[in-house]
Amino acid sequence: MARRGKKPVVRTLEDLTLDSGYGGAADSVRSSNLSLCCSDSHPASPYGGSCWPPLADSMHSRHNSFDTVNTALVEDSEGLDCAGQHCSRLLPDLDEVPWTLQELEALLLRSRDPRAGPAVPGGLPKDALAKLSTLVSRALVRIAKEAQRLSLRFAKCTKYEIQSAMEIVLSWGLAAHCTAAALAALSLYNMSSAGGDRLGRGKSARCGLTFSVGRVYRWMVDSRVALRIHEHAAIYLTACMESLFRDIYSRVVASGVPRSCSGPGSGSGSGPGPSSGPGAAPAADKEREAPGGGAASGGACSAASSASGGSSCCAPPAAAAAAVPPAAAANHHHHHHHALHEAPKFTVETLEHTVNNDSEIWGLLQPYQHLICGKNASGVLCLPDSLNLHRDPQRSNKPGELPMFSQSELRTIEQSLLATRVGSIAELSDLVSRAMHHLQPLNAKHHGNGTPLHHKQGALYWEPEALYTLCYFMHCPQMEWENPNVEPSKVNLQVERPFLVLPPLMEWIRVAVAHAGHRRSFSMDSDDVRQAARLLLPGVDCEPRQLRADDCFCASRKLDAVAIEAKFKQDLGFRMLNCGRTDLVKQAVSLLGPDGINTMSEQGMTPLMYACVRGDEAMVQMLLDAGADLNVEVVSTPHKYPSVHPETRHWTALTFAVLHGHIPVVQLLLDAGAKVEGSVEHGEENYSETPLQLAAAVGNFELVSLLLERGADPLIGTMYRNGISTTPQGDMNSFSQAAAHGHRNVFRKLLAQPEKEKSDILSLEEILAEGTDLAETAPPPLCASRNSKAKLRALREAMYHSAEHGYVDVTIDIRSIGVPWTLHTWLESLRIAFQQHRRPLIQCLLKEFKTIQEEEYTEELVTQGLPLMFEILKASKNEVISQQLCVIFTHCYGPYPIPKLTEIKRKQTSRLDPHFLNNKEMSDVTFLVEGRPFYAHKVLLFTASPRFKALLSSKPTNDGTCIEIGYVKYSIFQLVMQYLYYGGPESLLIKNNEIMELLSAAKFFQLEALQRHCEIICAKSINTDNCVDIYNHAKFLGVTELSAYCEGYFLKNMMVLIENEAFKQLLYDKNGEGTGQDVLQDLQRTLAIRIQSIHLSSSKGSVV
């Protein structure tokens, strides 16, 4: 093998010695990364490299790993298809995602840029929406998987785990956008918590989101992201998904790529062409914007030439870099100048083109288990916009100052970030040092843009073991052969990872920093690098990080030698206690410091807490015997213990034992005198979750029973640190935790717990809430005492969460004990029952609608409730359900009368004496109706209506000419003429069997006053027998006022009409190509208008 690969290796080494423009040569003419874009003028080498053009003499020199940014070694060609690298699919495409295409379309249309032109009349293409949904669902799975691993430390998923997962999976820019969106949504949610209608509005509405937060929460529970899901985590994940959708959609719309263009990997299977990559035109734009011409855009993009046209499983084969002069890129930009001004369209083609050419989102949306970062579908390495200094050439401290870096320094820094291989640990240390030095001031000037190093206490640094671990994954033995003192090995015992699967250094840094930041550490250790390798490299895996005492150990250089020595001794003491040997307790305590056995680590935890996390019952007993404090709390002082996780503040050893479900340890702590409520003191506010809340959330029946036996209070909730809470006892009590996670048996256990009597001291809020109920002798159920009132509030909150998350059985259980419905909880329960096709439950819920107070009717009834109920009516073949829906519709229509039709006052026009009606002697025009002449006068008819004027104008004025009128009976035509000659309908004698024909004639001759008169007669004569005929006739003629009146009659008398066969045929008959559906839509619209006028308007019924 060595002999076979010797010549290609020599060729590759020759390529490695060529200066690609980043070796610091000031006279390099190919100093731009854009010059590395692949070009058809340089055919691919059979050795997997590129045929380089003639080079300047100054470029023939040896250089370090800066040249490995986009240089492919010969072994790459053997593994370009990731053979043996386990490029398996991430997961099958999700069958069910926590959003619908309708919600996705509404989200994208709401966030549409007005500059993109008018919206498409028919909405966004369904195939493009489905494609986008499938792609982003992969990002959802990636973020959920990382959040799942992070949540193992505390057996709980909070907003911090979701935010860290976003920073791990997403690029710096995307993570910043998602974090900002999540913070905005959570702020709106917290502000809405202070309102009295918080349980009457959905979580999405309270957050200002389009996707259902409750559905995302249920998806997280069903996907086992964690044993416990905090509601803020679901809000963060929902906002993150919406932000991703908006970001990708805006990039597609802003791309301006014509539909005929297709990038690599867009389905055609062709290899990348000259215009592939993140866009030659945008790159050329960067050249022009930056000072120094092409040199200024160095590091913006690094392209790779294609050795073959096919696509590999990771990316199209990209070999060594090929040079393209800046002029060629400018010509390419000019070539696409007109394309950039074409109206962008959101189609499958433009979506694929944008994704394939965007290095920030292409790898994220691929189906492979590992995450491809920093490259697009062509294998082009690119820096994200947040790290590209050339986008802001004046990035200095003050205007007028010199730039922070020279152009050569910028190229060196950016190439440090893009390096994929190193030859030695010294070289890697230099690269990491350059990269971290670059990221530090960038983050300081643009704080909050998602870049790393966000700790205010100091800069992050790399531990030596972390650098050695990173060097193991990035090391390239062949690069050592440049040293003339090193002889290449004759036998290759190592399998080289192909270039295509190697991430750039900036991605190693990004992921490692995100892991270190999640545990609030100031240094990256080797485990952070292994976690990054697991994510970024195919076929690499490692266990999730466990909660350890040395997670955040930091030997900061700011501390003196004495302080560092004390820290090392303390760390040794914790290690001795964590090893599990009970015979080392006395020796370990002597090393911990002045606080002894109760010494806290950097994470604010004592040795007893760590033993409870491990479930080491023997060590717990030994620590208790040694005098460990049972009820000491995790501190909440970040300036002294900056590595404390925010969610663990005020937790006790019992809390940690409950978190990880160690029942024997819980029993031991309780027997030893641990407080069953954790850190909660009687009468004080609770800012952390109690052990019972945590046990109820996970559904541990045995643990819940044990805590209840020891006196735990299920009514205690959690106060948010911003002071916003709806009840004195906080939110998300144990009832709500069990209901939110769907633990029905635990909820019933909590419900069966007898109430504890409180003291007779009343708070001011309780006094005001009591009101006149103090004097009542027979209060309703659940209101017999102040405890019962608190329980009722807790159960109402639990009912809200169970309905939001789709646990309808728990919701019904809560309703069965007398907790009243809100409109929102009822609608959510009905929606879930309909989706699950549970007919008996639908009937039960529909029967309960009348228990909802009309004062609680909100806009949700119109926007969400009516569409749902009419959909059930359309889909249901059950007569009982249909009758119940009719009862609801009639109830919502209200007792007020149907809006009356009013006569139209006819404008005063010329009129003739009735004596001239059908008088042959005085007439000047003759109509022929049913073969019989009818004599009239033009002077009257010309001004009667536009229709008569058109009839008279279309006929010659010769004597004896008759105007034939078809489809109108003679008697009906006579009534029309009588109306005209008499000047009104007062003298008309209309028979019942003539009214419909007269209405048709009035509509045909455009006589609005006569038409309205006929409509009024029809409205007065409407009954259950003829209402369907009148409605059909009115719809056929297009008489909207009479149609609306009939729809009001239907809704007001629907309970009776549902037994009418003609009415049922009108609703359900599909022979008319969707006629039934149109009727239901019209009824829904009419009922919505009615509800608005009598329930939701300020007049409350005065306007009907």
UniProtKB/Swiss-Prot annotation:
Q: Which UniProt key words apply to this protein?
A: ANK repeat, Membrane, Repeat, Transmembrane, Transmembrane helix
In terms of PROSITE patterns, this protein maps to: ANK_REP_REGION (PS50297), ANK_REPEAT (PS50088), BTB (PS50097)
Where it sits in the cell: the answer is: Membrane
Bilayer topology: Single-pass membrane protein
InterPro entries associated with the record: Ankyrin-BTB/POZ_domain, Ankyrin_rpt, Ankyrin_rpt-contain_sf, BTB/POZ_dom, BTBD11_BACK, Histone-fold, SKP1/BTB/POZ_sf
Q: Where is the composition biased (Gly residues)?
A: 264-276
Checking Pfam families in the record gives: Ank (PF00023), Ank_2 (PF12796), BTB (PF00651)
Q: Where are the transmembrane segments?
A: 168-188
SUPFAM superfamilies for this protein: Ankyrin repeat, Histone-fold, POZ domain
Q: What is this protein called?
A: Ankyrin repeat- and BTB/POZ domain-containing protein 3
What is the protein's species of origin? Homo sapiens (Human)
Taxonomic lineage: Eukaryota, Metazoa, Chordata, Craniata, Vertebrata
